[in-house]
Amino acid sequence: MKYNIHVKRCKKCIMPEVPGHIVIDEDGICQFCKQYSKTQTDVAQTFQDFDAEKKLSILKKKVSKYKNKGSYDCVVSVSGGKDSIATLYIAVKVLGLKPLAIFVDNGFALDEMYDNVKNATDILGVDLLIYKTSDMLKLFHKLIKSGKKLYYCRICHALLDNAILSNCYKYGIRLVLGGYTKGQQYIQNQELMWIYEESDRNIIELLQDDEEFQKYIPLYENQHKFFQENYGPIQQLSPFKYIEWNEDNILKLITEELKWKMPKRSWPDKSSNCFFNYVAQYLAEQQFGYAQHESELSVLIRNQELTRERAVEIIETPIEDSDLQKALQKLNLSIDDIKDGGLYNHGKTTD
C-alpha cells in the first residue's frame, strides 16, 4: 500500500481499511471496534471498571514480592521517551522500588533520548546501564537490501527485549517494568498478527545462510517460546495497565520533575522514538497498510484515554525526505533503496 491522499479509516478508531485484514462496514466501523463493544457488553465487570485506588493497590501487591531480593528490585527499560521516563518515576516515587535503569541504543538514538535518561536517573538517584549494539545497523542494511516485506519495529523490539532480559538474568533481577501503554501491548493485538507472521517468515528465510545472524533465528521462529524458555522466571509488566495514561499529565510531570525535553523532531508527533522509526513506519505503510502505531492509538481511543481527533493528528505526522535520509545514510543506503524520491506524507483521513 502506498501513501495515498485519502485513507478510509474506522469512524470510531483510526484503523485504515486494508482488504482482507481490516474491514470497515457500511456504518464506517471496523471489526475490532465491534468486537470491543460486544466484549464490554458481555462482561459484567472488567478490570477497567475498577477505580484508580483499587488498580494501584493491585499493582503494589504484584511488585511487593520482588522487593529487597538483591541489589535491585527491578529493571526499568528506559528509552528516553515520555512513557518510559514516567515509568521510572512511578517505580521510585509511587511503588518505592530500587530499580536498575537499562537504556539500549539500537544505533539510531536521538541526542535528547540520552539527555532525558541521564537527567531522570541523576535526579531519581537510579543506577544506569547503557547497552549499545552494532548488530542492528548491519542487520537492517541486509534486510532493506533484500526488498522483503518486513516489520522493522517487531524485529527491533525482539532484539531490545532480548538485551534487557539477558541483563536481568545476568544481575539476578526477576521483574521488568516497561513504559508500555495499553495500546502498546503490541504482541497481543489481533490486527497485527498477520504482519508479524509474514515478517517473521521473511526474516527467518533471510537469516538461514547468514553465519553472523543465524543465532537470532530461534527468536523469530517463536518469540513467546524463546523468551519463556530462556527467561521464564522474569516477570514483565507495565504500570500503565494499572495507572491511567494521560499524555498531558505525563508531559507536565516529567518536564517539571525530571527535566525531560521533547525531541526537536521525531515520529510520530510528541514522541521520542529513534530516528529509524521514520523508515520503519514508511515501509510498514507501504508493505502492510498500517503498523503498531495505528493499533496502539486505536486501543487508547476505545479505552477513552485518547480522543480520535488527537489520534488522527498523531498518525498524520508527516515523513519527509530528510527524515528518511538521516536513518538510511547511517546504513550506507539511500532513498532509492526504498523508493524513488519525493515528499512522504501520511494519507489524510477520510470517513
Language-model segments: residues:
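Nucleotide-activated chemistry modules centered on ATP-dependent adenylation/adenylyltransferase
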Residues: M1-C74, I90-D351
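Short, glycine-rich nucleotide/cofactor-binding loops
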Residues: C74-D83
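Hydrophobic positions on the alpha1 helix immediately C-terminal to the Walker A/P-loop
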Residues: A86-T87
